[in-house]
């Protein structure tokens, strides 16, 4: 296996979805591609990819945006992992997370998918849940709004003002995760709980 990392930004293809909360993972990958200094190119695994290094002397990465609908992201992720010889412990899924507040980034390895069908499909395709996740908080829907309707809507006006900072923070989390490991990244991006 290789020391290359596969960083996958989850979302739906097509212009009509680009500003949706559900596509925040792909937005983070656009930020990372800027840091790598390369543009996305089509790959036979039904994905747009960027290959390069994150930072000078940084880790080798394949940034990937599956060009399938989110619920069937596993096929492209598995195909890319096989193509590049990347094991599941070097796969990072960047995705929207309704169970944490907007403007929050959290990291974990394995565990449940929390009803996220994109993660469920990746777990099935990789035959393991033991891959890294960078969870980008989009918050819960207001009132009785359906969760699917909420994540398939664009960010609100107030959120759009904060979104560049959130994308930058999530990209920083990916970089720290790759350079210093999960524990260091969690210590930085998970606020300490205060007593009381």
From Swiss-Prot:
It comes from the Bacteria. Belongs to the PTH family. Its EC number is 3.1.1.29. GO terms for cellular component: cytoplasm. It is found in: Cytoplasm. The record marks 12 as: Discriminates between blocked and unblocked aminoacyl-tRNA. This is Peptidyl-tRNA hydrolase. Transmembrane segments: none annotated. The keyword Cytoplasm applies. Keywords: Cytoplasm, Hydrolase, RNA-binding, tRNA-binding. TRNA binds at residues 17, 69, 71, 117. One of its GO terms (molecular function) is tRNA binding. Hydrolyzes ribosome-free peptidyl-tRNAs (with 1 or more amino acids incorporated), which drop off the ribosome during protein synthesis, or as a result of ribosome stalling. Monomer. GO terms for biological process: protein quality control for misfolded or incompletely synthesized proteins; rescue of stalled ribosome. InterPro entries: Pept_tRNA_hydro (IPR001328), Pept_tRNA_hydro_CS (IPR018171), Pept_tRNA_hydro_sf (IPR036416). The record marks 96 as: Stabilizes the basic form of H active site to accept a proton. Pfam families: Pept_tRNA_hydro.
